[in-house]
Amino acid sequence: MSIGILGKKLGMSQLFDDKGNAVPVTLIEAGPCRVTQLKTNALDGYTAIQIGYGVSKEKHISKPEKGHLLKSGEELLKHLKEYRVEETSSYEIGNQITVKNFEVGQKVDISGKSMGRGFSGYQKRHGFSRGPMSHGSKNHRAPGSTGAGTTPGRIYPGKRMAGRYGGKQITTKGLLVLKIDDQKNLLVVKGSVPGKPGSIVNIKPNNVVGKKGGEKS
């Protein structure tokens, strides 16, 4: 099973298939990442691979983090991520994880922080229908009733209301890998990916119940 990789979203573009149809794609600079730690059952209670991505300035790294990162290489890394594995014997501290771990035609799950849209109303945040815009109506973009009076006499927790929209960690599943450029560390996937250009994303094999992760389907 292939472990995941960290990368940076570059933006969106389009490719054309054999029939001339435009296919929307997202370009991701995936890795290279460095293995910074191997976790084992004996020491940690579980087996996992920790990788790092993105060079950081020394002033932004604490002394404990600096000591931890220098064990695997000379560069100080900004982003760390763990992936559970069954065995760590095939990895060594300092190994490079690149886009070669993935294949064209493979499906992946990509996680990232969605674009923040600030405080938004009911229509924009939840897709509510608006009220009449004329004929004396004063209920244009108002929410309508939020709860009854005597019973229950309150608004239930989780009621969809206006509030901060976006800026949350979300995952888009089952994205198809269309192209890989290992010279430029580029991964081209079909469809959109969470976040804005320049944001960090986590790419891992598609997790399908009943199948091993990363299998072609």
Curated annotation (Swiss-Prot):
Keyword presence, Nucleus: no
- Source domain of life is Bacteria
Does the keyword section mention Cytoplasm?
no
Q: Where is the composition biased (Low complexity)?
A: 142-153
Keyword annotations for this protein? Answer: Ribonucleoprotein, Ribosomal protein, RNA-binding, rRNA-binding
Q: Looking at the Swiss-Prot or TrEMBL record, what is one Pfam family this protein matches?
A: Ribosomal_L3
Q: Which GO terms describe its molecular function?
A: rRNA binding; structural constituent of ribosome
* GO CC, one annotated term: cytosolic large ribosomal subunit
Q: Where is this region: Disordered?
A: 129-162
By its UniProt entry, which Gene3D superfamilies does this protein fall under? 3.30.160.810, Translation factors (2.40.30.10)
Question: Which positions form S-S bridges?
Answer: none
Which InterPro entries does the UniProt record give?
Ribosomal_uL3 (IPR000597), Ribosomal_uL3_bac/org-type (IPR019927), Ribosomal_uL3_CS (IPR019926), Transl_B-barrel_sf (IPR009000)
Assembly behavior = Part of the 50S ribosomal subunit. Forms a cluster with proteins L14 and L19.
Q: Which HAMAP family match?
A: Ribosomal_uL3_B
Q: What does this protein do?
A: One of the primary rRNA binding proteins, it binds directly near the 3'-end of the 23S rRNA, where it nucleates assembly of the 50S subunit.
Q: What is this protein called?
A: Large ribosomal subunit protein uL3
Which organism does this record belong to? Prochlorococcus marinus (strain MIT 9215)
Top-level taxonomy: Bacteria, Bacillati, Cyanobacteriota, Cyanophyceae, Synechococcales
